[in-house]
């Protein structure tokens, strides 16, 4: 398992095994940084993607959930988010696997990693 952090005012995508850092695009409306990243992850790593949608504004990420689901990935969404529009839009897609508190999301990710480790041994 790996965790990657995006630099401020940038966007990330993955092609093959290489992350690419892009200048932040600013189309009309809300940015689509999470949508770009999730679509590229689904294409690059398939069923190993776990999309986690946390508190946030707008619908960023929701447009990519079909790609995550089609690749066999999992989708987790934060319940009780202080800024709930990103989780709400994700839930409205009908593609979400689990709606959890942040601590439950952390535990679920740990369990997923343990399962992956067992499968790769």
Region roles according to the model:
Residues 1-121:
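Conserved acid/base catalytic micro-environments in cytosolic active-site loops
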């Amino acid at each position: 398992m790996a965790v990657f952090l995006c630099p401020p005012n940038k966007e990330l995508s993955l092609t093959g095994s290489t992350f690419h850092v892009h200048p932040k695009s600013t189309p009309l409306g809300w940015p689509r940084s999470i949508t770009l990243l999730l679509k590229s992850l689904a294409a690059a790593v398939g069923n190993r993607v776990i999309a986690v949608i946390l508190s946030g504004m707008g619908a960023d990420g929701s447009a990519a959930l079909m790609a995550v689901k089609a690749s066999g990935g999992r989708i987790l969404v934060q319940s009780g988010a202080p800024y709930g529009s990103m989780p709400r839009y994700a839930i409205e897609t009908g593609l979400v696997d689990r709606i959890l508190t942040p601590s439950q999301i952390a535990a679920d990710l740990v369990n997923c990693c343990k399962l992956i480790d067992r499968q790769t041994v």
